[in-house]
């Protein structure tokens, strides 16, 4: 006896086999020198050009020597009162 509210199990489809020659062509297309078009990357680049953020891992402005342990440059103390 079947119930009106019972659901049947979904039918799973098998993927077609992937050929090695298809993989070689796909790998070559991934690394072509294309400009990144994501909104996140675009906003990040605009912020860097405006000087409002530190150089990111995506920019080539990093030297690799930047760490959190660097001593701050000597300068006058800033006051929050003006």
Swiss-Prot record:
Q: Where is this motif: Nuclear localization signal?
A: 10-18
Domain of life the protein comes from:
Eukaryota
Q: Which residues carry this modification: Phosphoserine?
A: 2
The primary location reported for this protein is: nucleus
For the biological process aspect of GO, one term held by this record is: chondrocyte differentiation
Compartments, as annotated in UniProt:
Nucleus; Cytoplasm; Secreted, Extracellular space
In this chain, the stretch annotated as Disordered covers 1-34
Tell me if Transmembrane helix is a UniProt keyword of this record. Answer: no
Q: Which UniProt keywords apply?
A: Chondrogenesis, Cytoplasm, Myogenesis, Nucleus, Phosphoprotein, Secreted
Cellular component GO terms, alphabetically?
A: cytoplasm; extracellular region; nucleus
InterPro entries from the xrefs?
Answer: MUSTN1
- What job does the chain carry out? Required for chondrocyte development and proliferation. Plays a role in myoblast differentiation and fusion. Modulates skeletal muscle extracellular matrix composition. Plays a role in skeletal muscle function. Plays a role in glucose homeostasis.
Family designation: Belongs to the MUSTN1 family.
User: What is the name of the protein in this document?
Assistant: Musculoskeletal embryonic nuclear protein 1
Q: Which organism is it from?
A: Bos taurus (Bovine)
Q: Which gene encodes it?
A: MUSTN1
